[in-house]
């Protein structure tokens, strides 16, 4: 049984078009309040983005569910996340696949996310402090790549790290941003625009 607050959120997500029950089950299983500051715990199950410090945010549950659904994951999918942030999206992915690789440019956020994931007994995650624009070449190729911040254009390194048939989901743009889905087919990349969004920018480089 889930709480009334969780059930209300799941009902809202279904009404917004989220159909993948495995994704919804993962959202119900991950305690979002563990990924926000104490001051925001009462709002953890509201369908809104919340600040997590360092100028970053935890995405609204709808966007987490939408982007995860677009990845078309199977338990065997090899997944790369760019922008670990609070670790919330990471935890959702960890409930759906056997292993998740995640890159975070801000060392403090990476450390906090690792601690939260460990406290929730989610040990099928590898995190790395690094430049998300470069992906994680040593672990490539990936069946699915998700980016939780917006670059002005799609990073070439991420497209090349997709396996055949792989899917990249990310927000793209500066003042006006759109959620894009990129699918690799042979030497081609098929790009679809999903919807207008608003994310923090994907900054190049690392931050200690």
From Swiss-Prot:
What name goes with this protein? Protein-L-isoaspartate O-methyltransferase
Q: In which compartments does the protein localize?
A: Cytoplasm
Catalytic site: 59
Q: Which GO terms describe its cellular component?
A: cytoplasm
CDD domains in UniProt: AdoMet_MTases
Could you tell me what reaction this enzyme catalyses? Answer: [protein]-L-isoaspartate + S-adenosyl-L-methionine = [protein]-L-isoaspartate alpha-methyl ester + S-adenosyl-L-homocysteine
Q: Tell me which species this is from.
A: Escherichia coli O6:H1 (strain CFT073 / ATCC 700928 / UPEC)
Keyword Cytoplasm in the entry? The reply is yes
What are the record keywords, sorted?
A: Cytoplasm, Methyltransferase, S-adenosyl-L-methionine, Transferase
Checking Gene3D superfamilies in the record gives: Vaccinia Virus protein VP39
Q: Which gene encodes it?
A: pcm
Q: Which InterPro entries match?
A: PCMT, SAM-dependent_MTases_sf
Presence of keyword Transferase: yes
Its domain of life? Bacteria
EC numbers: 2.1.1.77
Give the EC class as a word: transferase
- Mention one GO biological process in which this protein takes part, according to its record: protein repair
Q: What does this protein do?
A: Catalyzes the methyl esterification of L-isoaspartyl residues in peptides and proteins that result from spontaneous decomposition of normal L-aspartyl and L-asparaginyl residues. It plays a role in the repair and/or degradation of damaged proteins.
């Amino acid at each position: 049984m889930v709480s009334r607050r969780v059930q209300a959120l799941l009902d809202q997500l279904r009404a917004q078009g989220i159909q993948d029950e495995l994704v919804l089950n993962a959202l119900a299983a991950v305690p979002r309040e563990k990924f926000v500051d104490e001051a925001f715990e009462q709002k953890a199950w509201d369908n809104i983005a919340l600040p997590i410090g360092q100028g970053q945010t935890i995405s609204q549950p709808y966007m987490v569910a939408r982007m995860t659904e677009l990845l078309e994951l199977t338990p065997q999918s090899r997944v790369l996340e760019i922008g670990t942030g609070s670790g919330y999206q990471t935890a959702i992915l960890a409930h759906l696949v056997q292993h998740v690789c995640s890159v975070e440019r801000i060392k403090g956020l990476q450390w906090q996310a690792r601690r939260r994931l460990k406290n929730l007994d989610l040990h099928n995650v590898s995190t790395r402090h690094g430049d998300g624009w470069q992906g994680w070449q040593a672990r490539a190729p990936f069946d699915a790549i998700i980016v939780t911040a917006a670059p002005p254009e799609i990073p070439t390194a991420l497209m090349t790290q997709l396996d055949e048939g792989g899917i990249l989901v990310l927000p793209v743009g500066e003042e006006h941003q759109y959620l894009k889905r990129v699918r690799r087919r042979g030497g081609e990349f098929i790009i679809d625009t999903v919807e207008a969004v608003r994310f923090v920018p994907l900054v190049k480089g690392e931050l200690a």
